[in-house]
Amino acid sequence: MAAIKPITTYKGKIVPLFNDNIDTDQIIPKVHLKRISKSGFGPFAFDEWRYLPDGSDNPDFNPNKPQYKGASILITGDNFGCGSSREHAAWALKDYGFHIIIAGSFSDIFYMNCTKNAMLPIVLEKNAREHLAKYVEIEVDLPNQTVSSPDKRFHFEIDETWKNKLVNGLDDIAITLQYESLIEKYEKSL
């Protein structure tokens, strides 16, 4: 019973944003946290970097550059998603169009928020990220835990629980429903 779109293999366009310590307030400034729906946050992702003071696109911000338009894989620096634990940051990136984020490391809470929102966070060393950033498209194979460019393949680690959720398209509710008969049995025993 898939509740979210499963991730098995994914081929997508990349955009590099090699800043370290990108915090959740830089991903989605708190001024935009006025709704509880998961949608509608994409236009505010990286708001302070993405737009000039007059509201026009910042041409120096990589995701705004023509060669990166439509990118669905973000390759970034270390300690991505640090700061406050707002799930809105994951919502904003997902709504922007990212399906996979490759970083040197992630904040633990942000990592979990990605998986809960059907985004795959991948940890790779800097040399691997720099190599992958040379290409327009790369491919991710979650069951085999690899990220590939046309000429090289990199292995990544992921906890089996998160991998199972993403490969099978399971959210927390779908996982709970797998144990429905055991829950009902326990409730009857009370």
Curated annotation (Swiss-Prot):
Pathway(s): Amino-acid biosynthesis; L-leucine biosynthesis; L-leucine from 3-methyl-2-oxobutanoate: step 2/4
Keyword Zinc-finger in record: no
Enzyme Commission number(s) from the entry: 4.2.1.33
Extent of the signal sequence: none
UniProt keyword annotation of Lyase present: yes
Gene Ontology cellular-component annotations: 3-isopropylmalate dehydratase complex
Catalysed reactions listed for this entry: (2R,3S)-3-isopropylmalate = (2S)-2-isopropylmalate
InterPro entries linked: 3-IsopropMal_deHydase_ssu, Aconitase/3IPM_dehydase_swvl, AconitaseA/IPMdHydase_ssu_swvl, IPMI_Swivel, LeuD
GO molecular function, one term: 3-isopropylmalate dehydratase activity
GO biological process: L-leucine biosynthetic process
Keywords, comma-separated and alphabetical: Amino-acid biosynthesis, Branched-chain amino acid biosynthesis, Leucine biosynthesis, Lyase
Name of the top EC class for this enzyme: lyase
Entry function: Catalyzes the isomerization between 2-isopropylmalate and 3-isopropylmalate, via the formation of 2-isopropylmaleate.
HAMAP family per UniProt: LeuD_type1 (MF_01031)
Subunit record text: Heterodimer of LeuC and LeuD.
Alphabetical list of PANTHER family matching this protein: 3-ISOPROPYLMALATE DEHYDRATASE SMALL SUBUNIT, 3-ISOPROPYLMALATE DEHYDRATASE SMALL SUBUNIT 2-RELATED-RELATED
Entry's family note: Belongs to the LeuD family. LeuD type 1 subfamily.
UniProt-recorded name of the protein: 3-isopropylmalate dehydratase small subunit
Organism whose genome encodes this protein: Staphylococcus aureus (strain MSSA476)
Classification of source organism: Bacteria, Bacillati, Bacillota, Bacilli, Bacillales
Gene giving rise to this polypeptide: leuD
